[in-house]
Amino acid sequence: MMVVAALLSWFLLGLFIHYSKKFGWGQPIRQDGPQTHLAKEGTPTAGGVAFVLALLLVFVGLLAFGGIGQANLSREVMILLAALGMGVVGGIDDFLKIRSRKFGGKKELLAREKFPLQVLVALLFAGFAAPLASHQLLPGFMSIGGYPIFDMLFIAFVMVGSVNAFNFTDGLDGLLAGVGMIVLLPLVAVSPIAALMVAVLLGFLWFNAHPARVFMGDMGSHAIGAVAAGAYALYSDVWLLPIAAIIPVAAVLSVVIQVASVRLRKRKVFKMSPIQHHFELSGWPETHVTLRFWVVTGIATALTWWLMGGRP
């Protein structure tokens, strides 16, 4: 089914790119970013719609033909619903960006608008997931303080953090697709949703490799972050996710550090945040940043697999 998912993602993305160009669904580019990115102005965005749809269709097919065991069905449905919920939040942002480029008006969801929606989806997921999170939430601890409410809040925190961390990792051709696939690899044998996400990202990467013909947008990055958080929470030790996802963690931390430094010290720590753009402005070609970040993610994920004991 992974092959089917990859091919369906590839096919749907081809259609999406065609109609995006026809209707002018292009990505606006930050003028204060790397100058090499200005040529990307107008590249179709919100490609996450296509690969999330591919994931959903194949998952429904698996359900229809009994391809998902009853033991894991509730976990898989929870992860899927979290991915769709977060994807909708990101999709609203994508819609506003595309519409504003053509017609003006509101350019994006503000942080104070997006964050509460993310928290709502995360809390709904965590409320159902916490009782099923049978592995360690923190090293050596199956629970936090022995109170289920703390476990729920911690899982919700991880979900929101993951979604934003993966979102900040986007911005270079192929970067997030590759990082997302690698982070999910340890769980493909036990989580059909994780396996399908890896597969649909392969189909997406065909078009997103440098020079990218399509960007995933916030819908795609939000869905990837939700699947990563959900799968690690329900099938592994959730504290291992920040190790495997070292690049998304570095991306979100670089933004936090940059904002805090500018507000408190009136000085920047990085040439630009998230951190991938700092390396670009330091002279690294975009493709080098992407490939090296993939390598770092591969090493971190291998360490995660070892810490798992070679099992999810």
From Swiss-Prot:
Which keywords does UniProt give here?
A: Cell cycle, Cell division, Cell membrane, Cell shape, Cell wall biogenesis/degradation, Magnesium, Membrane, Metal-binding, Peptidoglycan synthesis, Transferase, Transmembrane, Transmembrane helix
Reactions the enzyme catalyzes? UDP-N-acetyl-alpha-D-muramoyl-L-alanyl-gamma-D-glutamyl-meso-2,6-diaminopimeloyl-D-alanyl-D-alanine + di-trans,octa-cis-undecaprenyl phosphate = di-trans,octa-cis-undecaprenyl diphospho-N-acetyl-alpha-D-muramoyl-L-alanyl-D-glutamyl-meso-2,6-diaminopimeloyl-D-alanyl-D-alanine + UMP
Entries under InterPro entries matching the protein: Glycosyl_transferase_4 (IPR000715), PNAcMuramoyl-5peptid_Trfase (IPR003524), PNAcMuramoyl-5peptid_Trfase_CS (IPR018480)
Q: Which is one Gene Ontology cellular component term of this protein?
A: plasma membrane
Its cofactor is: Mg(2+)
Q: Which pathway does it take part in?
A: Cell wall biogenesis; peptidoglycan biosynthesis
Provide the E.C. number(s) assigned to this enzyme.
2.7.8.13
Q: Name one Pfam family in it.
A: Glycos_transf_4
Q: Name one GO molecular function term.
A: phosphotransferase activity, for other substituted phosphate groups
How does this chain sit within the bilayer?
Multi-pass membrane protein
Q: Which GO terms describe its biological process?
A: cell division; cell wall macromolecule biosynthetic process; cell wall organization; peptidoglycan biosynthetic process; regulation of cell shape
Give the source's domain of life in one word.
Bacteria
Q: Which cysteines are joined by disulfide bonds?
A: none
What are the TM regions of this chain, as residue ranges? 1-21, 48-68, 76-96, 115-135, 140-160, 165-185, 214-234, 238-258, 289-309
The subcellular location is: Cell membrane
The coiled-coil segments of this chain are none
- Function, as annotated: Catalyzes the initial step of the lipid cycle reactions in the biosynthesis of the cell wall peptidoglycan: transfers peptidoglycan precursor phospho-MurNAc-pentapeptide from UDP-MurNAc-pentapeptide onto the lipid carrier undecaprenyl phosphate, yielding undecaprenyl-pyrophosphoryl-MurNAc-pentapeptide, known as lipid I.
Q: Of which family is this protein a member?
A: Belongs to the glycosyltransferase 4 family. MraY subfamily.
The protein, known as: Phospho-N-acetylmuramoyl-pentapeptide-transferase
Q: Which organism is it from?
A: Deinococcus radiodurans (strain ATCC 13939 / DSM 20539 / JCM 16871 / CCUG 27074 / LMG 4051 / NBRC 15346 / NCIMB 9279 / VKM B-1422 / R1)
